[in-house]
Amino acid sequence: MAVAYPTDKHVVHEETGKGLEVYSIWTAISNGKMPSNKQLRGLGSSLTDGAKSVAKERQKKISDPARKFFSDFSKLIDNSFNVFAKKNEGDLLQNAIYELSQAEGSTNVNEVWNDITEDMQSQDFSTEDLKQLFLLIFNNGKLRTLLQNAIVLLGQQTTNVASKKLNEQDGKKSDNLRNGVNKVKQNMRNGASARDQAREQGSKAKDKIKNDPDAQKAKEETKQKLQDLYEEFKSVAVDLQGDPKYQHPVRSLLNLIDKFIDKLSEQSGNVTADTNEHYDRAMQYLKQLVENILNRSLDNLIDTLKQVQHDAENDEELKDWLESTRQFVRKVLLKKGYAKSDASDKEFNKLRDKGDELLNGRYKKRWQQLSSEVKKISDSASSDKDVKQLFSNYKNIYGDLIKREGGQISLKTSMCLEILRLGVPVILEKMQYFPIPRLEIEQPDFDVVLENLNLQTANVLPKLAEFRNNNFVRFSPYANITSFRENMINVHLSNIQCDLKDVNYYIKRKQGFPTFTDLGVVDLLIGKQGMVVNLTLSSFSNTMFENELPDSFFKVEDVKVDIHHIKLKIRKSRHRLLLAFLKPSLMTYVRSTVARSMELSIRHAFEQVDREWYEIHKEAKSEIEKDSSKPTEDQESKLKVYGRVAYSRISNLHKSSKEKGKDSQVRVALHKENTALNNIVLPSGNLQRSEEKRRAALSGSTWHSPAFNIFGVDDSEDSDSPWATDRGSRLYQRTKGSVKSRESRLKKEKHKNRPASKGTYTTYTSSEERQRSTEDPLSHDTLSRTILNDQIVKGNVTEIPLPPLAVNEKRASVAVSSIPSFGDDQHDIELLNSTDPRKNRILYNQPPAVA
């Protein structure tokens, strides 16, 4: 056997369709499409089934900790999607994100202080801000602690702390008070003297509460907790100011709060807000989503805030205090250096004393009402059993993968390697083929276009990997002998195979002799030992004991690629005789060219990884050094810092690669819009199929897309699409049936599609075409046929008359974009791409099909 897994033409069409569906999903997401709750539930079922299948199929090779991980992972996925579907009932989050993306209005805030006027103008709360705020809450543990402490402190104000402390005193004081109350009740029957005695007893009780030391102690404790909360707030503000990517989301959130307050007051003060219907609908969706998460309506809280705003409109003192508090929060969060200044502490103390006077004075009842509502919401959210179970599952996964040693957090390396060893084969089994619809290579000497490249994942990956590590250390106590250390790693990868069938190619040699243009179909086989890669990496230091980081982690010393067995079979070509004569030298050229290009690609990839890895390490180490001055409990773990820095670096790299990819000499075109050499048309099926799925992925209304029907059909959208098959909600469920049954169906379809009579071309309605494509994935029509069928359904075209055929004359379909022959007819490429009817008539050697 030449390769480990030979290409099976009977299943390659179906398997490559899975890869094209992945491309279409990426296209849909890139264009703002999102899966619905039902579609996400199908994805969750697929992930759960995959995790269970790994544990089931590898029973003899799996350890108990790994089995526990896959079990916990299945439970986490199930509970996550169930909680999400329950809280997000009605696709609230998707609707909110879509409305935010469609909003044209902006939330503009006037100048609140002169230092940051320009920065506060035209801040839009967008979907990117929503994502960054979510990441901020997820990554910043101090912010989560701050929110929790604020809610707890606010909830403590629902009842009179001093009264609680008084009721918790010893039995003697309680009995005295109870006896006093009973005595008052008994004497109430005695008329005016009893009422006077009751007043006297009541005033004594009030004096006890007022002068009680426990009440004063509780008040001081509350004041101290508020001071601690402010210190935590300053610490969070300093962290946010040190990360530029959070500045815009924080400003946008503050503007959103200003806008909300402006709506409560029903009039504009110093803040003006511009809005539109999309923005208002987005806020309604988000409000409903928050209520579902908290398990309680926010209407009472909003009504209370409206009453507070109404009080502020009628009380200048309260209004000034609220406005000063808002401006103070802005300064601390946005003005660099202000949080650490003495001016901020003085202003905080001033605002705290004034607030204590107002909230514990004439607005005490309103403040208790607000605190009570916040506590009810907090209690309702914390008592959610589903969320508690979800956090329990998350802790189990965290414990399976993370270990704590010496106060530091690190990954369980052996566990992660075992998960990869067990999971990767299952993933490769599910995705056997990796399609590349079109590959374009532009060089000064030649242009090459390849289509219908269906790579087998099991063949492309090396079957054997070897690593060898060599260490060399030299040191001496004498100054004239330089200490030296070097580490060298040798990597050997072999049995990298490839079996490509029916590859459509176009090649044009622009310089040298001879210049020629050719196109055709070729089979490429790299088998047996296949491609062998030998890579040598080294890391060295000129000094034995150096503390500073080197410029890089490793250096690529040598890359050697050998291709031991390559076979090229040219099935169709415009220059068959010439290629047959030049085949020996051509094989040598192809082998050396492929090996050289692979060497350059591997070297470039490792050098880029080294640069990015070094920058990530350098930035993370700098942040860790800054955190070292903080208390131990406030320091972030190294794993978390590295993960956050790596995520930010990879995101920036992805954006820059998009811009550079447009001018790259080697391009992978997923659909027609990505092609640069669009004047070159090859008879490949993958590019047309990818284009169909791309158009269908963008065809859904608003944020819906039929591309996500691969997970599960969305009832809210028309499931009449290329994804509406009988596969159900499983991602990798395969079509049943043997090769014989598939071939017999193909023969029946071929007989069925014959023209009904001379001079006519039989077509089918769109529903019939979809039924045929569902019955067998191989019976695939191109984009031109789809467009033609749509016109027939609309009634624009009923029958296409064709002139009668001559004797022994063959007719070529005009509904299929294909080139009939490469070997018999030596046509020029310009003729193949021409839209001139006369040239097309020459090409097909027949009259035009449509007059």
From Swiss-Prot:
The keyword Lipoprotein applies. InterPro entries: HAM1-like_C, HAM1-like_N. Keywords: Lipoprotein, Palmitate. Residues 165-223, 714-781 are annotated as: Disordered. It comes from the Eukaryota. Palmitoylated. Residues 165-176, 196-223, 767-781 have a biased composition (Basic and acidic residues). It holds the Pfam family HAM1_C. This is Putative cell signaling protein. It comes from Schizosaccharomyces pombe (strain 972 / ATCC 24843).
